[in-house]
Amino acid sequence: MLKIKASITGVIGGFVSGMTGIGGGTVMVPLLTGFVQMRQHRAHATSLVIVIFVAISAATQYLMRDQIRWDLAIALSIGAVVGAQIGARTMHSMPEKNLRIIFAIFLFIVGIRLIFGNSIIDLSFDGQTLSSNMQTVSALLIGLIGGAFGGLLGIGGGAIFVPALVLILGQDQHIAQGISLIVIISTALSGTAVNLRSGYIDKKIVIWVTPPAIVLAIIGGYIAGLLDSETLSQVFGIVVLYVAIRSFYSTWKKSRQPNNS
């Protein structure tokens, strides 16, 4: 039964990763903790290993369509890896509850914007008018901020990277997702290198989840290529809204626990 649950987790997480470029961990971690009944630390560490294979598989679809800007991907990766280390080292001294609320509000606004466009919330900035060097510097800063939030909150940065690339740097939704997957590979490798020493990685779950996740990541990436940018942005917006609502709920749930009162 555990193997079946792990396989279902791989199917859902892999498909979401390929479709949206957010790595799959955003969906996998809740499934691993709630559905597979893993402890939080083990779920995070195990998910990170799976995400490496999932992101590589999904990225191949974007690579074949030439939907990756490597200058931005490299700059984002450098910033994200550094930011993640900073976030992870300072997470115990920061008010996690407030950070989660801010993050959830940010994602909620972004989700509404991506689903309904400028008619409700206009967050657009024409980043295409920036010089190539300024876009690279901006990508480095976005990576630093996104990586730091990821390290602080124990989340993947894809939910931050993709909206920032679209709304700030004016990138097409497909290209933003392709870039995000490359960055996620870098950050997942960095995080896994640290986790290998912690003993939190469940190799059995990795073996069960990864194969279906890889297959569905490729399928998700292929389907994403069939959608126009506006439709794909709306799909991504729905996923981002889910992440925002889940973040609100988990923060509320923690606040009601006796040791948090």
Model segments located where?
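Transmembrane helix boundary and interhelical junction motifs in multipass membrane proteins
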Residues: G21-V29, L152-A164
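Transmembrane alpha-helical segments of major facilitator superfamily
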Residues: I50, A75-L76, I179-V183
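Membrane-embedded alpha-helical segments of transport systems
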Residues: V49-A58, T90, I185-S190, V215-L216, ...
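Juxtamembrane transmembrane-helix boundary motif
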Residues: M1-F15, G34, Q40, T60-L152, ...
